[in-house]
Amino acid sequence: MTEVGAGVVERYLECLAAHDWDGLATTIADDGLTREGPFCDVVEGKQHYVAYLRKVLTNLKGHRLEVKRVSHVNERVSYVELSESFVIDGVPATWPECILFEQGDDGLISQVSVFFKQPGGGTA
């Protein structure tokens, strides 16, 4: 992996939080990007993915991103635990998530898988 790959996931998160779509695009592979969402939805391609994020996140009032932890499994795979907060119908909401990032040989993000954390029925 090239030096480009170092810190790419962190830069992606910074750009996402700032709604810096051009900056975000620099962290994503030009070819072969696949984003799998928590509802089994799939977005393919860098341009489609950036356009999708721009549409969804700019329409959420009060959108905030709080990164709890970034865990690098190796130079290609990272997990990020975070919460996204926003206002829906005047009511504040927070969604805890875990996102899996995979990076290609060029160090850029080529795979994104989003998982929601669900509240349980009690302690185990």
Which positions does each model-derived feature cover?
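Hydrophobic pocket/interface hotspot
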Residues: 12, 24-25, 32, 45, ...
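Short, low-complexity N-terminal intrinsically disordered segments enriched in polar/charged residues
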Residues: 1-27, 31, 123-124
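Flexible, glycine- and charge-enriched loops at secondary-structure boundaries
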Residues: 2, 42, 46
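A short gly/proline-enriched turn/hairpin at secondary-structure junctions
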Residues: 33-43
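A beta-strand edge to alpha-helix "cap/lid" segment located at domain peripheries
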Residues: 4, 50-124
